[in-house]
Amino acid sequence: MTEHRPAPRTVVITGASGGIGRACAAAFAARGDRLALIARGRAGLDGAVHQAERAGAAKAIAIEADVADPDAVEAAARRAEEELGPIDVWVNDAFSSVFAPFTEITPEEFRRVTEVSYLGYVYATGAALRRMLPRGRGTVVQVGSAIAYRGIPLQTAYSGAKHAIQGWHEALRCELLASGTAVRTTMVQMPAVNTPQFDWVRSRLPRRAQPVPPIYQPEIAARAVLYAADHPARREYWVGASTVATLIANAVAPGLLDRYLARTGFDSQQTHEPRPADGPDNLFEPADRDTDFGAHGRFDRKARARSRQQQAAHALGSLGAAAARTAGRVIPGLRRRCPARTPPPSRGRA
């Protein structure tokens, strides 16, 4: 019995030159899809196109564009349809961040992260829907994060952007359902992933930035995006047991999680190596303009290539059971590590 494979589709991916977006390009290419790959860095884009062609893409084109520019995004969507045909799937993955305490982030930096990591999703989804809705078909996949539910220290700008995406996506999904269209939008909440962003992110930390363990390979994330594109009726997917644990712990005991992250969230986001003073910085200019970093970061030896939770979550109804089991393990552990402080004695009235 042969495996069912969908007919080749036209797929647009933002942030496609590295990390999760790059891995998504390879995954869709292996299905024989037609790909429009959007990013700012020329070398990274060229590498992504060559990799997609080797993986089996029917056709792959590189489009240099900044998702913070709505006109550039609209032009990219127009070119994708002119060269590849009607867009069937649009994947939003482009983002930027700043690793620093909130008081050390400038207004310009905060605005830039918000424009790329939140408004970039808004502009790109708008460009996709302007084409999908008149045809009555199409899927938009938003690459999210556990940080969409649970902000973490040293990433206030990125945490705010991911929370904004979550609220906007929920509202948009309701509107699409109310309209009766077959166009769907779904979200994939990611764990920590081994991507190049930790080498090129703007950082004021004393040591090199790293994803909070456990770390997963970008191919895990790409498989989840591929599955979500094929099954967009579900509002969102959670990837990795750590994502499930974070979301459940935050829902059940957010105060405990505050204290836990206050104790662990600073060291866990840094390696033991000092941060290089002359490292690349992609906040305002692409770090991969002249160098192709690929999909993987520097944490291959630590990263996991499989996610048993992800495989289980594809089965209907299993996510709730997994969440209940995870909550049973996580909450007692948080309480042991972060005992509540004894409240001060109440004062009577004079």
Mark where each language-model region is.
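The beta1-alpha1 cofactor-binding region of Rossmann-like NAD(H)/NADP(H)-dependent oxidoreductases
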Residues: 65-75, 107
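Residue(s) in the substrate-gating loop at a strand-loop-helix junction
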Residues: 145
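Substrate-binding pocket helix/loop in short-chain dehydrogenase/reductase
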Residues: 101-102, 109-111
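Conserved glycine-rich Rossmann-like NAD(P)H-binding loop of the short-chain dehydrogenase/reductase
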Residues: 31-47
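Conserved glycine-rich cofactor-binding loop
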Residues: 17-18
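Active-site helix of classical SDR
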Residues: 125, 161
